[in-house]
From Swiss-Prot:
InterPro entries cross-referenced by the UniProt entry: Rotavirus_VP2 (IPR007779)
Family matches, as Pfam families: Rota_VP2 (PF05087)
Stretches the record annotates as Disordered: 1-43
Membrane-crossing segments per the record: none
Site note Interaction with the intermediate capsid protein VP6, residues: 220, 224, 228, 839, 841
Organism from which the protein derives: Rotavirus A (strain RVA/Cow/France/RF/1975/G6P6[1]) (RV-A)
Official protein name in the record: Inner capsid protein VP2
Amino acid sequence: MAYRKRGARREANINNNDRMQEKDDEKQDQNNRMQLSDKVLSKKEEVVTDSQEEIKIADEVKKSTKEESKQLLEVLKTKEEHQKEIQYEILQKTIPTFEPKESILKKLEDIKPEQAKKQTKLFRIFEPRQLPIYRANGEKELRNRWYWKLKKDTLPDGDYDVREYFLNLYDQVLTEMPDYLLLKDMAVENKNSRDAGKVVDSETASICDAIFQDEETEGAVRRFIAEMRQRVQADRNVVNYPSILHPIDYAFNEYFLQHQLVEPLNNDIIFNYIPERIRNDVNYILNMDRNLPSTARYIRPNLLQDRLNLHDNFESLWDTITTSNYILARSVVPDLKELVSTEAQIQKMSQDLQLEALTIQSETQFLTGINSQAANDCFKTLIAAMLSQRTMSLDFVTTNYMSLISGMWLLTVVPNDMFIRESLVACQLAIVNTIIYPAFGMQRMHYRNGDPQRPFQIAEQQIQNFQVANWLHFVNNNQFRQVVIDGVLNQVLNDNIRNGHVINQLMEALMQLSRQQFPTMPVDYKRSIQRGILLLSNRLGQLVDLTRLLAYNYETLMACVTMNMQHVQTLTTEKLQLTSVTSLCMLIGNATVIPSPQTLFHYYNVNVNFHSNYNERINDAVAIITGANRLNLYQKKMKAIVEDFLKRLHIFDVARVPDDQMYRLRDRLRLLPVEVRRLDIFNLILMNMDQIERASDKIAQGVIIAYRDMQLERDEMYGYVNIARNLDGFQQINLEELMRTGDYAQITNMLLNNQPVALVGALPFVTDSSVISLIANVDATVFAQIVKLRKVDTLKPILYKINSDSNDFYLVANYDWVPTSTTKVYKQVPQQFDFRNSMHMLTSNLTFTVYSDLLAFVSADTVEPINAVAFDNMRIMNEL
């Protein structure tokens, strides 16, 4: 019973569970229905998404359909769509464009001939100054006296002596030395004149004013000032102007007037100023204005050649000068016009290569990097590099056969010297091992680094085929010819390149290579090379034209180069990508481009101005070095002179030039002769050093030293000071002798015997290497009393108003008390200003006009570019 009951209960439970499950299902269905009805009736928006599994299946279906459509598209692609793919690939492989350094170009173009600056005043070292007069008791009188003093009386701080002061003065004279003086331009009205007369310059007028207003001026002098005026001799085109000058200043200005650099200007001079090749070029039509006045003048530019030979052992300097020339040349090379449409050309190349659909063939690389910007960039780079003699380096991918075939044209047209050897060897080796040797079934060339022969030279000996060997021989011997034209060394291209005949030689070699069997290479390889050669050979006519165009533009611009074209490998190189050479070969059209006359004249003017400035700065530096040697400035740092020389050339970053090149440059400058005018000016200064020293407030003619205190003496110009005006009664020793021998025993003995010693020779008042410091360092025990146990540097024998123990500069007011000192400055009296001795008449031309830009008189035009002819009297571009 129990068992049965248990079983019955189990069955009952199962039945109950089933019923419960059914009820739950019914409830769930009802709920679902309720939710659906609610969703339908509700205004809320809900996003219903599929389950993840369904999404995955849908994605797979989409992927499969996409793949199928892709395959269909690849098969059915039109040439236009294919072209777009190629274009996209080109965009991915961008060619770096040249970014000109605007600052360098501006520096070059801003160099103007300094001769053109107008002089507004005469050159002066001295000026008259009023100084008070002191009575015997030290009181200042109301009267004044006029003395000649230096205008710029500045001694720089530091280790500096009087001879160096004179060297600086000489440098200042060279900087201010005018190349011409036209007194009419600087003349000003004399305010005190009776009949509105003029004096030579504003400084003369101001001196006249000051003297006229001075109460102590004599009546005769005032009357003379009232009569001062210019005297004109119109028949001789001459004018005389009154001037007030120190005799030394008069000597300077008279010399400048007699040695002016201006020369008469006429049409023949302008005609001969234009480079001869441009004058004789039938493509340029030049006309000149015939209305030049008889008073026209010009300053002949200084275009001496090769005095420093910067190309020889001056790597940094040569690199800088060629870089600036390269940037200038690029700015004047004309832009190519009417290039073949990139899209059309790539489409045509695709047809020639039979690239109807994208394949994984090496030919697809042939089309990469082709664009008009790269073609124009390549054209400018080649011409500018040859003009400036900048070394180029080649960038290429060995697997891009089209680049290498274009490189064969490049090596045919551009001489080997223009490429850095490592880059040239790599390119030649790639051409030999990729194209030439495989064509004849020869083994790869294993080139040893450092081999004196280049790969093409080795290949020339091993290739039996005449046409290929003949082309290799031409490339191996492709060098610039050095020709002197108008006194300038020019690097001229081979005649076969100038007339374009060499391209036929190249094509013969290429056709021979394309006919070979490539026995050791697969068929695809042979076909790729042949198709690449076909692409280039299809443009035979355009390549001949391109070569002629390149040579013509190079030679026309070369006519405007005024400095010798020395070829030496440069430290840095200009990069040239072979893909851009391919662009140039494939896109060159039939439009001729030649430099405009305005561009040529601009290029010529910039070259002339730089060259002339370069020579003038050399003359200055040589003169300063000679002056330093004549002044016995053994300790003068010559490097500073060379640095100044380079700074004045504007284009050099002087701080980065290595020291060894600085000293080599100094040695070269030392060997050059001094220009006559600069030598004469130095001799004028040397003859008058004593007068200049006297006029300075900071240069003394000696110093007196003693153990015992010396009384201050009355001086008419300064009152009671430690200044001695004569050396009567003093033992004298020459400072130059003392410094040269270094023997101080004589001074020591005198001082021990209480005898004052006068050291005679020019010395600055304030200097860290003064004579007293020098002597005191020799024997501190003997000279302890002189330096009074103070720092040597603080002992400055300058015009003490009280005594050397005081830093204050009070005038002496207590006449009963006489202060003393242990040092005296020996100073000679400066030259007194005497109006009659300072009045000079200066003579110059009444009037003339200096023209700096001679080419402004020339109006120029060109023939229609399509009719432009090359040196052989045939059109530059024949393929129309």
